[in-house]
């Protein structure tokens, strides 16, 4: 892979889940990579261990002799490193543009959707690895079977998440597209659902004439795109008209069984070690692509049944005194709803939730929907809102969700602003047999081990 005379690249916000994977791929291909981030985490520690220089904080001197500066969506325009790069006429590009360059040199498979991107990409990557195709895989989460967020393969395929935020996915050049779900989100950027759907249509139609668009027939918004799609369409889902279909679905604890059909022909039975029908649909998306490549059913079955999941997706952190603690990345009302439904099916016990809202704008736009989705839990604790890339919005706090949940009938809901007090609050309430979930896209995952410690006492 050659980028002309560009040899040194600096990543601003290198600890971001989408940034670190690209940095690692380029590092593995011989580029000199440096990066900076506001905080040091397991991700930045990993990058340091493999030889990438990472510094904490953003100052102009960090870019050193970089030939190009790569920034994430979370980086503000007044960032001193960005300003220094512009002053010195060093190219500044967004993460998605760099991912587009990587994808341009491979047969790219872009997985897009409001929900399910990470799990679908992870399953597909694992499946292609098991099929011996040695793909490059770039995921927005740590794939347990890969042990990382990225795998650099020698094959022709590159599988990556395609993020719709700020139309980032329009920078990509996919040879094949996967559309999981479409729903209102990122309303700080998009005007409405119609604008979101138009962006997804534009993304899908970037597929060349020799590619295909694999879409979820169970999602009405995705289906609504079909009349405007100009490339071959393949469908997956549980509806009887889907090309790749699951039937006889049985949820059993944290796993799901189903029969797989392709064009109404039964291929066989699959035991998926993931909970919920939503994960069956994620698996079907990956299977649809696998069948496009003529991967045999037995290989598909073996790959799915050996899939170990994704970090922060229904992720068991540990158990203490008969109380299990899970962590999940859900940060949209629909994601919370399907996670808690799966939890109720899996455990048949009391479910305690610690939810940390992510983004002021999302909380403002969906606080009532969040409250409704959280009514299924037996105890609800709201943590302080995680702002991520946003500045505060007057009057918008986690208290809005707490108040709405109480208004809608939740009998055991609290807002605890000090996150350090949450573990003891859980320990006082929890009983053997209960299940605790920390939920959110911010740093709430760090509270899960602390809850386990509190449960020891």
Region locations from a protein language model:
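N-terminal leader/targeting and accessory segments in enzymes
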Residues: 1-94, 98, 212, 220, ...
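Nucleotide phosphate-binding/pyrophosphate-handling subdomain across enzymes
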Residues: 2-10, 18, 25-29, 253-254, ...
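Conserved hydrophobic helix-helix packing surfaces used for dimerization/oligomerization
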Residues: 8-11, 69, 109, 135, ...
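Phosphate-binding loop of NTP-binding sites
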Residues: 25-31, 48, 61-62, 73-217, ...
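Short internal beta-strands
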Residues: 31-38, 212-217, 353-356, 377-387
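Beta-strand->loop->alpha-helix junctions that form or flank phosphate-binding loops
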Residues: 36, 55-58, 93-97, 138-139, ...
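Short acidic/histidine-rich motifs immediately flanking catalytic phosphotransfer sites
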Residues: 63-68, 156, 431-434
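C-terminal helical cap/extension that packs against the catalytic core
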Residues: 371-432
